[in-house]
Design a protein with these regions (language model features):
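Domain-length cofactor-binding catalytic modules of enzymes
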Residues: 1-160
Length: 160
């Protein structure tokens, strides 16, 4: 099982790299620095199962995504249990989001960010379904130091 899981995690890492390469090439960008942050995996070197967290060893660079509108936090790990939260966390389940949120509000919240993905199939990924940036910033202090907040100019979410 562990062997197959390692192969799957390696495949996922290479797949993410391929997606980044396609986007960077298509937009004519050149990467200055890259790093990878993954969540919901087994760190076989440290034998830590991370569900809802990411590796945050002392000085390790990591990304904490917030939502489609607010962007992400680039952070440096503080070695608090070698982990930090992997994202903002949901305020509501996917089903509850589909039932409670409106496309009109979703469209309004995403104004100013280029995306073709503000569609009914991604309503459960709308900013309103997640905790706020302010709440996350207030809570992550023991786990990670915020280096920079990055804001989206382009957002893509795959739908079924």
């Amino acid at each position: 099982y562990i062997h197959d899981m390692k192969l799957t995690q390696q495949f996922a890492m290479l797949n993410r790299k391929a997606m980044v390469d396609v986007i960077m090439t298509g937009m004519g960008f050149t990467a200055v620095e890259t790093f990878t942050t993954i969540h919901n995996y087994i760190d076989t070197d440290a034998m830590i199962l991370r569900k809802g967290s990411v590796s945050a060893k002392a000085g390790e660079k990591l990304l904490i995504p917030i939502n489609m509108r607010d962007g992400s936090l680039i952070c440096s790990g503080k070695d608090w249990n070698c982990s930090a939260p992997h994202g903002a966390g949901r305020l509501m389940s996917r089903k509850a989001a589909f039932n409670a949120l409106s496309m009109e509000e979703f469209q309004k919240e995403m104004e100013g960010i280029y995306t073709t993905c503000v569609v009914p199939d991604t309503l459960d990924e709308s900013p309103m379904a997640y905790k706020s940036m302010e709440e996350i910033v207030a809570q992550i202090g023991p786990t990670a130091e915020i280096i920079e907040r990055i804001r989206p100019v382009y957002n893509f979410k795959a739908a079924d």
